[in-house]
Amino acid sequence: MVERVEALADRKPNEDRPVPAITVPDITVLPRIPEPDPTVARMRAVRSLTTAPSGLEGEGFPVRRAFAGVDLGDLDPFVHLDQMGEVDYAPGEPKGTPWHPHRGFETVTYMIDGTFEHSDSNGGGGVITNGDTQWMTAGAGILHIEKPPEWLVVSGGLFHGFQLWVNLPAAQKWTPPRYQDLRATEVALASSPDGGALVRIIAGEVSGHKGPGSTYTPMTLVHATLSPGARLSLPWRADYNALVYAMAGHGTVGSEARPIQTGQLAVFGPGNTITVAAQQAQESRSPNLDILILGGRPIGEPVAWMGPFVMNTREEIMQAMADYQAGRLGTIPAIAAVHNAPTTIVETGQPRDGEPAH
């Protein structure tokens, strides 16, 4: 059912044309998400709206730091979100990240366009492309590497995706590492009542439609595309927080119809319904409003965050550093270069400059 809007082979490096999203041949055949019952719906208002700064990650690929400037208390159970790339690389340009450690959380890498390879010290890994998701539970500790395949480095091509960090409760931070390979064809698809919005449910549940991702932390992750003038209202669990990130386009969010545009994050207040609408006029490069909608049950525990480690206390962070330096987080091939461990600990707050590689 899932198809590309245009073939990768037809793209020329560095052309200023839209980066296509995953779509379907006929949205009218998809199940519809019903309009919320007005007698019970409580529309969430927008608590804050921030604009993501741009930076470089890993070996130099561009990112937008979607959560920058937002208090971790509003993000809980999430820690970090990067919009990666949205570029059409020339030959030799694609970049990745070298081998590096993680402990205490999960990384969720969602590829919209392009191809990324993953390998880890637990034997997990694979290649994700065009709507695929890799869900890596670092848990007690793991080493991994993420990079474009060699053929993409040689030829150049599209690269656009997201990486989300999902915190783990203290009781599950020591769970064994695992890897989930979620293909685009497994993602639950639905539409708005009028067919103007395509909803892809990667994890969690929306109106009975369940995504394939298996999560330790109760949460929902959705990628939605709204055509110009379309409106989408989603039922949203009242015990979850709610965030909307605009990856492309212009629209409004929340009960007060607050304007939102590319690179902005809306944090919602309490309620059980999220409302988003696309402006009728969109830019040629972004003909639709593309958004990530995410939320989960707050963990409500202290957070100590240093680079690639997310724990509950400073002592646990120091132990993670020691375990990494001693080789207790796994082994990698001798030819691979390992980054230096970072040196700044952030406790229950937003990370400082010099954030970790993914």
Residues covered by each model-derived region:
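Jelly-roll (double-stranded beta-helix
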Residues: M1-H358
